[in-house]
Swiss-Prot record:
Name by which UniProt lists this protein: Low-density lipoprotein receptor-related protein 4
Effect the entry attributes to changing R1277H: In CMS17; decreases binding affinity for AGRN and MUSK proteins; does not enhance downstream activation of the MUSK signaling pathway thus impairing clustering of AChRs
Source species of the chain: Homo sapiens
Task performed by this protein: Mediates SOST-dependent inhibition of bone formation. Functions as a specific facilitator of SOST-mediated inhibition of Wnt signaling. Plays a key role in the formation and the maintenance of the neuromuscular junction (NMJ), the synapse between motor neuron and skeletal muscle. Directly binds AGRIN and recruits it to the MUSK signaling complex. Mediates the AGRIN-induced phosphorylation of MUSK, the kinase of the complex.
Biased composition, class Low complexity, residue ranges: 1676-1686
């Protein structure tokens, strides 16, 4: 409370300034100026009062720095002159207030779990570096800046934020450093068609635009709206649509976001009960001169009399005139007060005598005595105050002073003691409390996300993002849940505190849930809703929802709970702002505060301090009070532009402010120490302190059994109450009814509500339904408890149980404005009117067997009711001639019964007892009734009916809804009297019904075997009482009971999300959805097979072609791969084929009707082919092409005889059809807006229909053409010969695409291929001259012209993100074919095993290695764990091992092909290994590494003898492949943009191709090198010898990755591991000179041996003679050593063994295995072993000599050898020293992005990321920024190839041949090198083993170098 000062005696002067200005105090010369107060007040005192030991200023500022009289011997003299007890010195407390009593104290020893402060205090070690100044001198917070994690960004102030927040356009660092030095801002992506874009770029659903809610957060979604939702009475609507209290209009304070409430205001609009501030603002008159600055400019406190006594400090005296003086001036003989009250007899002042002296009897003082101006002045010790007698002292009750203790306080004589609640601990200052447990976290809603911030560090993290409009917030610490409300979605949601498992809690019946509170003791959820003016409660999962408080509530906002006391508190900022409380069961409601409140927003409870705090956004203040509302006090009244929410923790307040977009803090007692925790937030909303002590433990009054309650158990004081969900009656003290028997049912557009008649409160609650957007009509069926409703926004009819369960859509097609609904509870039929289509329809109650009853002479039919007893239905029609009609429920006997004095006849109701028909007329403003035949018409209510809409009857009452009064009312159904209002202030009221269980039963013939009807049996007024009817589009047969099986003649069309049919057999046009039970995304092309009754369609979003029966059954996808944009589709019903065009791939393809035997027919010179039609009898197919040069073409149906028919005056030729009868070709052009025709050769061109707005699909049947139009959203018809008589077939059909006309009665015609497929083995395709046989893409046709090879022999296999594809090299058309492997996400690396015919691949999205057959079957995961980024993969087809690189883990691993026996081979000195390749015959393993030091390395297949081959002049070595014939390695460098090669030792290096764009992977076959390129999106090849003859094999392929060749020539040769796994139990690794056995890193159930032995062969399901091109599993004739290799006779697979293998004894000439006799293998091994021992000694000697010779001639000082020892394969400590090549600066900031997605154009100028790190990127950045120039080291250009000639050409420097290692390699390969020219004459021929493909192959000739 601010002190008010008057004109004081002795020149005391008060200078009070407004809160908005900074005071400048100037006192007179004879006065002392006190310190300026926190409220800006100035105080002047007489100068002689300074340093007199008296607190005259009230803040001791007049005594600061004064030298006071000497303290008594029993006291301690502080440095500031203060006297304290000596016993208080060095006790750890700052009693002097300058810490001088704690200086020079002996050091205090702290415990082991304590931290020693520099000031001598001891605090808990846990408090060290927790961001809180616990020591008092901040010595516990002098900490090193904490390190940010790898996924965090460090702000300039040292705080850490999430890395992805860097440069995201949102300031997340407190200093804004995360948004500095960012690249140019990227414009926000546009919103889609169903969204609205806010002013700052955010997208919201379009339905939220102009709905009256601030969904954008800046009101931009509500600006420029033509109309807004009307505000309530007592509210003012801002221009933006916001509703505020009407009293805030022209009150001088801008409450509207656009300040429109203060526009056009007169000079004064204040009432007689208000005071006008200088600013023009109006405040209550009672607030004038109350000591509070309510005007915010202090004008309400100016010129005030002294209306009350200010509160003086504890050591001050209150004068009668209100002045405060120091206690020492009391009874000092001087009139210090000015009114002599300090010297009056009432103060027991005794007369002064001259003998007074402190030396005599201590001057009569009880404690301290001092002489002041010659007189005795008695004073007291600290903790005491001088009594009125001026001599004695009494104890000061410090506990009565707020803020002395943080929580608890106990007073004692001359002292006090602070204490803390459970869960807190007293700090070293002995006054404040610190919470035990984890560091506190501020949890706050930020509209679009929910974040956590550390208040002492200003660091915050994201908890939940991508939210719509999160406002209210709370948490449940024990259950680790966070709850929030979203006022845009009108939902309450929850999630785990780690952000996972988001789920809806309350999803219906909310309008503006602005407050949320969790009862953590009883597990309940409470919330306020200012839209519905309610406070509700439910379980934590939203179950058992109950309206707790609803009466006398206006706009409840904030809510807080005190579960320990069973109390709920809330704020209400309606017309009468207040803060209220009640028990948590809603009882005991009471007002806490209702004065000096404007806009009470946030509310929080200090449980330990037993106080509440709230913010007032309009009053700009933070206040506190006791929990009963007493001791109310303003804590902060300055610097609060718009506080919204508040929380408290320990001694601090934290609040959010909308205006400053910040989180702030201050001391909860004084309001001082204000600090900005976070600013520059998006839109801070609710805030809470996340800490266990904010939810202290309490007694659960309901116990473990919910208090015995069947539903809700709610605390009530210290007891509890059993409560029922809203509407359910209580049947006992603890039990509720399980169902509702009768209730009023009404629609409110966005929800459907009920008012139970089982309870007395008549409060409405929402039926929990999803996606109700604009409900209008209602009805119900009590037999199955269903409620039905129509929705005119979604154009659907739905139903659900009365409790909201079992919700389903029953009719969702061909509805435009279903406004009326009626249930025939007798025959279970659903009737409805549609004002958009002007129809009345009926269906079964589940929506099946729908049919049109009345379609003529209807003009906006509205409501409908049925009377099953008489068999009639009644409806209102409020078109041009308003009327009420009736007809039989089968549409018979139609007649108008009321046609006069009607305007807008709305609701209808039937009184079945009195046989009356009631209706409401909104135009006539009446409710009337008449007999069921229209007679005896009478007005029931004719006044005070502004706009009645819905109408119903129940019992003796009639109920109706009124749009204008926004109410539900009732009256007596016979007299119209006794009117009452059931509910009011309900927006958008629609239909109304009473659900009950007393509908009269009616007998009907339809109940017996459906009346004999095959489909629909309807009630009828005819003598039989019923009639049979057929579903829409189907005719009733002559028997009057049976319907035809289906449509004979019909249109069928695609509408993107569905396929529909329009029957041409009936007299009206009505579309019917083909009930295919799948989700369609973008259905475009369509075709029909009338023979089997199937429809075919393409979906360009799902990339598939599908088919189903015309009744929707038997759906199947026939083409699922290799499609991009299938715009055209045609079914050859005669030839049983399906044809389609693909605009994305620019191809025309054909396949069998089941999708098999797929073939590309046309692929050259196509540019966006679209429509396609067939003429089987003529053998032609026609198609449109609307590319750059639009044209219409024709070819044979086998792709032959291609010709352009028309190529001029075409724009966008869309639809295409053939008129076989008149031999005409017809097409629709959307650009020229014409439908044209020509003959079948393109001649005689003429226009049929013009203009047409945007035609798309075109078809023909009989004498008419039909077309779809995008712009009119309609289907049109015209005469096919003249184009005249254009009519509208169906309208209001958005998304119209292709269309076909079908007459199933027409004969199909003759099949050119006959009954035996023309003798073709695969495809038989018609052509003008007959037919031709064709093969699926990539397979060759044999010489007989009829038979196809079973499969391709040589082909490319490549990966492209989500696909694996094949390109045959056997045929000339290099078109790709998808390998149908399922579940591909992000495939990177590939390899193939020719033995089992399986493809192996890595998927870095799933982090797995998988394999599958080439037909897509038998897909299985080989390695499914422990992978991060598997970039490289290689199959050892001999040893049956699998190798891979892992860039994420920097390892090279191996396993068996089935994933077993997994082992890490190399895990050191690797920095992002990429490609990998194996050479089993030589036992070599090669890989590239493009880390910090790019290199290419080689090792043995077990990882030993590791060697760096190339480490200079490398950038990003990506792909790697081996040429097994020429013994060379090839690689691509994506940084240097070239393809290079070298020999197997890294020598004879040669640049093959320069200036390639961005190569990724490569492979070799025959004389060609093939590679994939990211930038050109293509597969290319060059001659491997010259680097010339560059060709593009395949273009326009997104996301190209790995590529390999599958060929019988690739996986040849063998080694010792090829026979029975080398005798190893687990892993067998071939090496350059021997082989080794190895054990897996994780042992399995089998014992592992490192010594080769006899291992029984594993049984095989398939014989090796059938599949395997390598050695079969047979026991070795010799036991292999792990260090030596024995020459022995092994099996040979003819054609797979080289001469060198044969010379080494690795090949046998017989295909039959020769098993060893018992013991023979051992004897032979002994003999051979002895021989080899001698040879080994000789070899070692020779090797030593060679080594010395080599060393003398060649030394590589930069190369260190890596040695590996069996079995651990640990590397030696010797490091490989390689020259480091620097990477770009941003290289290390990039990560491997695994999510799939489209690749954008890569250009040399724009590629964002280093390709090897992020294989997926769609962003743009400067490519040159990523590359750094690397200096060439001038290496040798070498060319080492095996030539067909007998010479070797080596271009090298003169010193190059001194390399003895290279010379040795050349000599070795002279005997091995085979010619790669397949055209040469073979030296021998032999049969090849079957590799899975049947083939014949010519062997290559051999020549010596």
């Amino acid at each position: 409370m601010r002190r008010q000062w008057g004109a004081l005696l002795l020149g005391a002067l008060l200078c009070a300034h407004g809160l908005a200005s900074s005071p400048e105090c100037a006192c007179g010369r004879s006065h002392f100026t006190c310190a300026v107060s926190a409220l800006g007040e100035c105080t002047c005192i007489p100068a002689q009062w300074q340093c007199d030991g008296d607190n005259d200023c009230g803040d001791h500022s007049d005594e600061d720095g004064c030298i006071l009289p000497t303290c008594s011997p029993l006291d301690f003299h502080c440095d500031n002159g203060k006297c304290i007890r000596r016993s208080w010195v060095c006790d750890g407390d700052n009693d002097c207030e300058d810490d001088s009593d704690e200086q020079d104290c002996p050091p205090r020893e702290c415990e082991e779990d304590e931290f020693p402060c520099q000031n001598g205090y001891c605090i808990r070690s846990l408090w060290h570096c927790d961001g809180d100044n616990d020591c008092g001198d901040n010595s516990d917070e002098q900490c090193d800046m904490r390190k940010c994690s790898d996924k965090e960004f460090r702000c300039s102030d040292g705080s850490c934020i999430a890395e992805h927040w860097y440069c995201d356009g949102d300031t997340d660092c407190k200093d804004g450093s995360d948004e500095e030095n960012c690249p140019s801002a990227v414009p926000a992506p546009p919103c889609n068609l169903e969204e609205f874009q806010c002013a700052y770029g955010r997208c919201i659903l379009d339905i939220y635009h102009c709905d009256g809610d601030d969904d954008c957060g800046d009101w931009s979604d509500e600006s420029d709206c033509s109309s807004h939702q009307p505000c309530r009475s007592g509210e003012f609507m801002c221009d933006s649509g916001l509703c505020i209290n009407a009293g805030w209009r022209c009150d001088g304070d801008a409450d509207c976001d656009d300040q429109s409430d203060e526009r056009n205001c007169t000079t004064s609009m204040c009432t007689a009960e208000q005071f006008r501030c200088h600013s023009g603002r109006c405040v209550r008159l009672s607030w004038r001169c109350d000591g509070e600055d309510d005007c915010a400019d202090n004008s309400d406190e100016e010129n005030c009399e002294n209306t009350g006594s200010p509160q003086c400090a504890l050591d001050q005296f209150l004068c009668w005139n209100g002045r405060c003086i120091g206690q020492r001036k009391l009874c000092n003989g001087v009139n210090d007060c000015g009114d002599n009250s300090d010297e009056s007899p009432q103060q027991n002042c005794r007369p002064r005598t001259g003998e007074e002296n402190c030396n005599v009897n201590n001057g009569g003082c009880a404690q301290k005595c001092q002489m002041v101006r010659g007189a005795v002045q008695c004073t007291c010790h600290t903790g005491y105050r001088l009594t009125e007698d001026g001599h004695t002292c009494q104890d000061v009750n410090e506990c009565a002073e707020e803020g002395y203790c943080s929580q608890g306080c106990t007073n004692s004589e001359g002292a006090f003691q602070c204490w803390c609640e459970t869960g807190y601990e007293l700090r070293p200052d002995r006054r404040s409390c610190k919470a035990l447990g984890p560091e506190p976290v501020l949890l706050f809603a930020n509209r679009i996300d929910i974040r956590q911030v550390l208040p002492h560090r200003s660091e915050y993290t994201l908890l939940l993002n991508n939210l719509e409009n999160a406002i209210a917030l709370d948490f449940h610490h024990r259950r680790e849940l966070v709850f929030w409300s979203d006022v845009t979605l009108d939902r309450i949601l929850r999630a785990n505190l780690n952000g996972s498992n988001v789920e809806e809690v309350v999803s219906t019946g909310l309008e503006s849930p602005g407050g949320l509170a969790v009862d953590w003791v009883h597990d309940k959820l409470y919330w306020t809703d200012s839209g519905t003016s309610r406070i509700e409660v439910a379980n934590l999962d939203g179950a058992h929802r109950k309206v707790l408080l609803w009466q006398n509530l206006e706009k409840p906002r904030a809510i807080a709970l005190h579960p320990m006391e069973g109390t709920i508190y809330w704020t209400d900022w309606g017309n009468t702002p207040r803060i209220e409380a009640s028990s948590m069961d809603g009882s005991g409601r009471r007002i806490i505060a209702d004065t000096h409140l404007f806009w009470p927003n946030g509310l929080t409870i200090d449980y330990a301090g037993r106080r509440m705090y709230w913010v007032d956004a309009k009053h700009h203040v933070i206040e506190r009070a006791n929990l009963d509302g007493s001791h109310r006090k303003a804590v902060i009244s300055q610097g609060l532009p718009h506080p919204f929410a508040i929380t408290v923790f320990e001694d601090s307040l934290y609040w959010t402010d909308w205006h400053t977009k910040s989180i702030n803090s201050a001391n909860k007692f004084t309001g001082k120490n204000q600090e900005i925790i976070r600013n520059k937030l998006h839109f801070p909303m609710d805030i809470h302190t996340l800490h266990p002590q904010r939810q202290p433990a309490g007694k659960n009054r309901c116990g473990d059994n919910n208090g015995g309650c069947t539903h809700l158990c709610l605390p009530s004081g210290q007891n509890y109450t059993c409560a029922c969900p809203t509407g359910f009656r209580k049947i006992s003290s603890h039990a509720c009814a399980q169902s509702l028997d009768k209730f009023l049912l009404f629609a409110r557009r966005m929800d459907i509500r009920r008012i139970s008649f089982d309870t007395e409160d008549l409060s409405d609650d929402v039926i929990p339904l999803a996606d109700v957007r604009s409900a209008v009509a209602l009805d119900w069926d009590s037999r199955d408890d269903h409620v039905y409703w129509t929705d005119v926004s979604t154009d659907t009819i739905s139903r659900a149980k009365w409790d909201g369960t079992g919700q389903e859509v029953v009719v969702d097609t061909s509805l435009e404005s279903p406004a009326g609904l009626a249930i025939d509870w007798v025959t279970n039929k659903l009737y409805w009117t549609d004002a958009g289509t002007d129809r009345i329809e009926v269906a079964n109650t589940d929506g099946s067997m729908r049919t049109v009853l009345i379609w003529e002479n209807l003009d906006r039919p509205r409501d409908i009711v049925v009377e099953p007893m008489g068999g009639y239905m009644y409806w209102t029609d409020w078109g041009a001639s308003p009327k009420i009609e009736r007809a039989g429920m089968d549409a018979s006997g139609r007649q108008v019964i009321i046609s006069s004095n009607l305007t807008w006849p709305n609701g209808l109701a039937i009184d079945y007892g009195s046989q009356r028909l009631y209706w409401a007329d909104a135009g006539m403003k009446t409710i009337e009734f008449a007999g069921l035949d229209g007679s005896k018409r009478k007005v029931l209510i004719g006044s005070q009916l502004p706009h009645p809409f819905g109408l119903t009857l129940y019992g003796e009452r009639i109920y109706w809804t009124d749009w204008q009064t926004k109410s539900i009312q009732s009256a007596d159904r016979l007299t119209g009297l006794d009117r009452e209002t059931l509910q009011e202030n309900l927006e958008n009221l629609m239909d109304i019904h009473v659900f009950h269980r007393r509908r009269p039963p009616v007998s009907t013939p339809c109940a017996m075997e459906n009346g004999g009807c095959s489909h629909l049996c309807l009630r009828s007024p005819n003598p039989s009482g019923f009639s049979c009817t057929c579903p829409t589009g189907i005719n009733l047969l002559s028997d009057g009971k049976t319907c035809s099986p289906g449509m004979n003649s019909f249109l069928i069309f695609a509408r993107r999300i569905d396929i529909r049919m329009v029957s041409l057999d009936i007299p009206y046009f009505a579309d019917v959805v083909v009930p295919i039970n799948i989700t369609m995304k973008n259905t475009i092309a369509i075709g029909v097979d009338p023979q089997e009754g199937k429809v075919y369609w393409s979906d360009s979003t799902l990339h598939r072609i599908s088919r189903a029966n015309l009744d929707g059954s038997q759906h199947e996808d026939i083409i699922t791969t290799g499609l991009q944009t299938t715009d055209g589709l045609a079914v050859d019903a005669i030839g049983r084929k399906v044809y389609w065009t693909d605009t994305g791939t620019n191809r025309i393809e054909v396949g069998n009707l089941d999708g098999s035997m797929r073939k590309v027919l046309v692929w050259q010179n196509l540019d966006s082919p679209r429509a396609i039609v067939l003429y089987h009898e003529m053998g032609f197919m026609y198609w449109t092409d609307w590319g750059e040069n639009a044209k219409l073409e024709r070819s044979g149906m086998d792709g032959s005889d291609r010709a352009v028919l028309i190529n001029n005056n075409l724009g966008w030729p869309n639809g295409l059809t053939v008129d076989k009868a008149s031999s005409q070709l017809l097409w629709a052009d959307a650009h020229t807006e014409r439908i044209e025709a020509a003959d079948l050769n393109g001649a005689n061109r003429h226009t049929l229909v013009s203009p047409v707005q945007h035609p798309y699909g075109l078809t023909l049947l009989d004498s008419y053409i039909y077309w779809t139009d995008w712009q009119t959203r309609s289907i049109h018809r015209a005469d096919k010969g003249t184009g005249s008589n254009v009519i509208l077939v169906r309208s209001n059909l958005p998304g119209l695409m292709d269309m076909q006309a079908v007459d199933r009665a027409q004969p199909l015609g003759f099949n050119k291929c006959g009954s035996r497929n023309g003798g073709c083995s695969h495809l038989c395709l018609p052509r003008p001259s007959g037919f031709s046989c064709a093969c699926p893409t990539g397979i060759q046709l044999k010489g007989d012209g009829k038979t196809c090879d079973p499969s391709p022999e040589t082909y490319l296999l490549f990966s492209s993100r989500g696909s694996i594809r094949r390109i045959s090299l056997d045929t000339s058309d290099h078109t790709d074919v998808h390998v149908p492997v399922p579940e591909l996400n992000n495939v990177i690396s590939l390899d193939y095993d020719s033995v089992d015919g399986k493809v192996y691949y890595t998927d870095v999205f799933l982090d797995v290695i998988r394999r599958a057959d080439l037909n897509g079957s038998n897909m299985e995961t080989v390695i499914g764990r422990g992978l991060k980024t598997t970039d490289g993969l290689a199959v050892d087809w001999v040893a049956r091992n699998l190798y891979w690189t892992d860039t994420g883990r920097n390892t090279i691993e191996a396993s068996r092909l089935d994933g077993s026996c997994r082992k890490v081979l190399i895990n050191n000195s690797l920095d992002e290994p990429r490609a990998i390749a194996v050479f089993p015959r030589k036992g070599y393993l090669f890989w590239t590494d493009w880390g910090h030091i790019a290199k290419i390395e080689r090792a043995n297949l077990d990882g030993s003898e590791r060697k760096v081959l190339i480490n200079t002049d490398l950038g990003w070595p990506n792909g790697l492949t081996l040429d097994y014939d020429t013994r060379r390695i090839y690689w691509v460098d994506a940084h240097l943009d070239r393809i290079e090669s070298a020999d197997l030792n890294g020598k004879l290096r040669q640049v093959l191709v320069s200036h390639v764009s961005h190569p990724f992977a490569l492979t070799q076959q025959d004389r060609w090198i093939y590679w994939t390129d990211w930038q050109t999106k293509s597969i290319q090849r060059v001659d491997k010898y010259s680097g010339r003859n560059k060709e593009t094999v395949l273009a326009n392929v997104e996301g190209l990755m790995d590529i390999i060749v599958v060929s019988p020539q690739r996986q040849t040769g063998t080694n010792a591991c090829g026979v029975n796994n080398g005798g190893c139990t687990h892993l067998c690794f071939a090496r350059a000179s021997d082989f080794v056995c190895a054990c897996p890193d994780e042992p399995d159930s089998r014992p592992c041996s490192l010594v080769p032995g006899l291992v029984p062969p594993a049984p095989r399901a398939t014989g090796m003679s059938e599949k395997s091109p390598v050695l079969p599993n047979t026991p070795p004739t010799t036991l292999y050593s792990s260090t030596t290799r024995t020459r022995t006779s092994l099996e040979e697979v003819e054609g797979r063994c080289s001469e060198r293998d044969a010379r080494l004894g690795l090949c046998a000439r017989s295909n039959d295995a020769v098993p060893a006799a018992p013991g023979e293998g051992l004897h032979i091994s002994y003999a051979i072993g002895g021989l080899l021992s001698i040879l080994l000694i000789l070899v070692v000697i020779a090797a030593l000599m060679l080594y010395r010779h080599k060393k003398s001639k060649f030394t590589d000082p930069g190369m260190g050898n890596l040695t590996y020892s069996n079995p651990s394969y640990r590397t030696s400590t010797q490091e490989v020293k390689i020259e480091a090549i620097p990477k770009p600066a941003m290289y290390n900031q990039l990560c491997y992005k695994k999510e799939g997605g489209p690749d954008h154009n890569y250009t040399k100028e724009k590629i964002k990321i280093v390709e090897g790190i992020c294989l997926l990127s769609g962003d743009d950045a400067e490519w040159d920024d990523l590359k750094q120039l690397r200096s060439s080291r001038g290496g040798l250009l070498r060319d080492h190839v095996c030539m067909k000639t007998d010479t070797v050409s080596i271009q090298a420097s003169s010193g190059s041949l001194d390399d003895t290692e290279t010379e040795q390699l050349l000599q070795e390969e002279q005997s091995e090198c085979s010619s790669v020219h397949t055209a040469a004459t073979p030296e021998r021929r032999g049969s090849l083993p079957d590799t899975g493909w049947k083939h014949e192959r010519k062997l290559s000739s051999e020549s010596q170098v």
